[in-house]
Amino acid sequence: MAKKVTAVIKLALPAGKATPAPPVGPALGAHGVNIMAFCKEYNERTKDQVGLVIPVEITVYEDRSFTFILKTPPTAVLIKKALGIETASGVPNKQKVGKLTDAQVEEIAKIKMPDLNANDLEAAKRMVRGTARSMGVDVE
């Protein structure tokens, strides 16, 4: 028989740097999850992606055990990494912060494909271009 799910918690944590401090501790502690076990496992599974923010969906069961699914990093984080910038534009229509090539857009779209509700790569590329434009990034 399947275990009964008591909660689904969504967090966005820096890869390889999860600690029991907020936001992890309070979110998991409220459901009686072993916080250190989660932190160790999360850090182990994300150690090759250090520097990125990785969203995670934690499913907590009735017996206080848990499983978690790692998602792909947010599109904005991947765009900032590709351009080597810290922050996006505060006024995206007037102030541009960089240019993204079509090859970079395609690479980001391929990374994001499992989490997007796009049917093909072209649709995924359009989503990435839209995110880039809203960040003040020109797309060539």
UniProtKB/Swiss-Prot annotation:
CDD domains, A to Z: Ribosomal_L11
Signal peptide limits: none
Annotated function: Forms part of the ribosomal stalk which helps the ribosome interact with GTP-bound translation factors.
Pfam family, one: Ribosomal_L11
Superkingdom in the source lineage: Bacteria
Claim: RNA-binding is one of the keywords in the record: yes
Keywords tagged on the record: Methylation, Ribonucleoprotein, Ribosomal protein, RNA-binding, rRNA-binding
Any GO MF annotation of the entry: structural constituent of ribosome
GO biological process annotation, one example: translation
Self-association state and partner proteins as the record states: Part of the ribosomal stalk of the 50S ribosomal subunit. Interacts with L10 and the large rRNA to form the base of the stalk. L10 forms an elongated spine to which L12 dimers bind in a sequential fashion forming a multimeric L10(L12)X complex.
One GO location term (cellular component): cytosolic large ribosomal subunit
Gene name, Swiss-Prot/TrEMBL: rplK
Modification after translation: One or more lysine residues are methylated.
Family the UniProt entry places it in: Belongs to the universal ribosomal protein uL11 family.
Descriptive protein name: Large ribosomal subunit protein uL11
InterPro entries recorded: Ribosomal_uL11, Ribosomal_uL11_bac-typ, Ribosomal_uL11_C, Ribosomal_uL11_C_sf, Ribosomal_uL11_CS, Ribosomal_uL11_N, Ribosomal_uL11_N_sf
